[in-house]
Amino acid sequence: TEFPEVAHAMLYAGVKKLTDFQDPAYAGEYLTRMAALLAADRDNGGEAKGFAFTVAAAKYVAVAMAYDDVVRVADLKVRGTRFERVHNEVGVKDGQILYMTEYMHPRMDEVCGTLPKGLGLWIEARPKLFAFLDRRVNKGRRVKTGTLFWFSSLYFLSAMRRIRRGSLRHFREVEHREAWLHQALSVLPANYDLAVEVIATRRLVKGYSDTHARGLSKFDRVLSAVPMLQPREDGADWLRRLRQAALIDESGIALDGALKTVATL
């Protein structure tokens, strides 16, 4: 597929990001998905709009595909470039040894996410077993990543990227991503600008653990207003305001107020 020049920079960044996150084949999946989104964009007057839908999707589909999970966090913590950067920032001199202490607080739902889909679902379907395991896992730990034991442990976790596609977390990420893209595509023929904002709303989902859960909740709440906004010419502006309200207030009070306003339009 020949992508419009305006999307090239974002697509290049997306391919680079996803190759680093997983592998070249995963970046290929991204380009295949983007080709389908570009076709929908063309069919709905995207050229006259500067292919804004494709450009936004090039950025946020890559962000969605490169989600933060246990494997990603472990991978980033054992990279040589990270140790080199910290050494330079701290100013370690020749002959000195630097040990880094990381705070980690894993939860059982994150552990289940790294497991094969079937096993993860099997554990989640047994509340007593899940709670038993969570009591043993859900603890704050200060980890010295420069020691052989912890470096090896994190290195092993980072190597699980090879089986990431079969994990429960990956299954759920794909499911959520496709639901989001389906919503954007369903809006596209009727309200192009609103569809672009649906894509851009993905910026609310970021981070890891509790941060990710809060972002996901805000994302779902903001997009719940799309059916009300779709018939409106200013629907895109209102969705943008909802997203900004979600970004500026961690407590969600501003978003609650904005959603109530939209409901009265």
What are these regions (language model features)?
Residues 1-265:
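Active-site loops and adjacent core secondary-structure elements that bind or stabilize anionic groups
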